[in-house]
């Protein structure tokens, strides 16, 4: 009987740990462009890692509007769009003041509308196959199932670090 209680206690603790892990809120996102990987963190602890597709010109930081590059630097999630043409999207606060200055020095605009998003309805069937190539205009793309999970885990105000 005592052994059974201990076993039940261990199962209960494990279940509570799983529930806590799935309800933790992300406080930082790290995107490693070279690895095509996005990691959600909470208090320095990895919550989840996703494979991603990037801008169609993935090497180097975004410099000007229309260059199809994914930015590099430190940003925040400053808005969520539940009516996105890409299922759901989280807006990244690009361009920063530094990004604006760099583009201005080239006589150009820095661009904007950089998001973490899912797949447009006509392409949702592709699921993880969409990652076979970098195809966005500079955004970070995941599957629709993944963006639904990310949507729940990432609040507005979350820090985003995009590394080469």
What residue spans do the PLM features occupy?
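Bacterial N-terminal signal peptides that target proteins for export
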Residues: 1-9
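Bacterial Sec-dependent signal peptides at the C-terminal "C-region" and cleavage site
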Residues: 12-25
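N-terminal post-signal-peptidase region of extra-cytosolic proteins
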Residues: 22-27, 33-34, 54-79, 97-102, ...
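Well-ordered beta-strand positions in beta-sheet-rich domains
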Residues: 28, 49-51, 74, 113, ...
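Short Gly/aromatic-enriched secondary-structure transition segments
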Residues: 45-57
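Exported/periplasmic cell-wall-interacting domains
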Residues: 79-164
């Amino acid at each position: 009987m005592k052994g059974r209680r201990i076993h039940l206690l261990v199962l209960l603790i494990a279940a509570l740990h799983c529930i806590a892990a799935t309800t933790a809120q992300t406080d930082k996102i790290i995107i490693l462009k070279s690895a095509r990987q996005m990691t959600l963190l909470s208090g320095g602890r990895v919550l989840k890692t996703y494979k991603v597709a990037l801008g169609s010109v993935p090497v180097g930081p975004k410099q000007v509007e229309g260059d199809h590059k994914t930015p590099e630097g430190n940003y925040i999630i400053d808005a969520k769009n539940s009516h996105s043409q890409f299922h759901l999207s989280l807006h990244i606060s690009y361009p920063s003041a530094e990004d604006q200055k760099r583009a201005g020095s080239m006589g150009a605009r820095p661009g904007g509308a950089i998001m973490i998003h899912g797949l447009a309805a006509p392409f949702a069937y592709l699921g993880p196959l969409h990652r076979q190539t970098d195809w966005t205009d500079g955004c970070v793309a995941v599957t629709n199932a993944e963006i639904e999970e990310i949507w729940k885990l990432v609040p507005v105000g979350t820090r985003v670090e995009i590394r080469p």
